[in-house]
Amino acid sequence: MNFKYIFAVSFLIASAYARSVQNDEQSLSQRDVLEEESLREIRGIGGKILSGLKTALKGAAKELASTYLHRKRTAEEHEEMKRLEAVMRDLDSLDYPEEASERETRGFNQDEIANLFTKKEKRILGPVLGLVSDTLDDVLGILG
């Protein structure tokens, strides 16, 4: 009788352990699915934010270009206009990166490609940072 009792208790413990392991695996797989869904949502939100920023930058650059277009420009303003046009081309190339990279990298070696992208980053960041600093100066001047 003791043998039957020990066997029954052992069987109950083993089945309870198996059920708890199975439940743990199911909850882990459910957590993985939820984490994957949240990562997709985060990526989607990040993509929308980047798209919005890109659109805003394009709009700001177009607005600046139109203000400089209809009046006489100094040499400095002409250079700034050229930089803004380059920024617009670079922003447009972000919409179609495959075509832009094919156009730009045809016939270049790796060092020239690296230099080209470094120059492109400087061309984008220079005018954008200038606009941001001018805007902040204006805002601080109004507040101060």
Swiss-Prot record:
In the record, Leucine amide modifications are located at L143
**Propeptide stretch(es), residue numbers:** 19-43, 74-123
Regarding tissue, the record states: Expressed by the skin glands.
Please give the chief subcellular localization of this protein.
secreted
Q: Name one Pfam family in it.
A: Bombinin
Subcellular location field: Secreted
InterPro entries in alphabetical order: Bombinin
Give the record's keywords alphabetically: Amidation, Amphibian defense peptide, Antibiotic, Antimicrobial, Cleavage on pair of basic residues, Cytolysis, Fungicide, Hemolysis, Secreted, Signal, Toxin
Show which residues constitute the signal peptide. Answer: 1-18
GO cellular component terms attached to this protein's record: extracellular region
Please give the Gene Ontology molecular function terms for this protein.
toxin activity
Annotated GO biological process: defense response to bacterium; defense response to fungus; killing of cells of another organism
Q: Which family does the entry's similarity section mention?
A: Belongs to the bombinin family.
Function of the protein: Maximin-3 shows antibacterial activity against both Gram-positive and Gram-negative bacteria. It also shows antimicrobial activity against the fungus C.albicans, but not against A.flavus nor P.uticale. It has little hemolytic activity. It possess a significant cytotoxicity against tumor cell lines. It possess a significant anti-HIV activity. It shows high spermicidal activity. Maximin-H5 shows antibacterial activity only against the Gram-positive bacteria S.aureus. The other bacterial and fungal strains tested were resistant to it. The presence of metal ions, like Zn(2+) and Mg(2+), did not increase its antimicrobial potency. Does not show hemolytic activity (in a concentration up to 80 uM).
This protein is called Maximins 3/H5
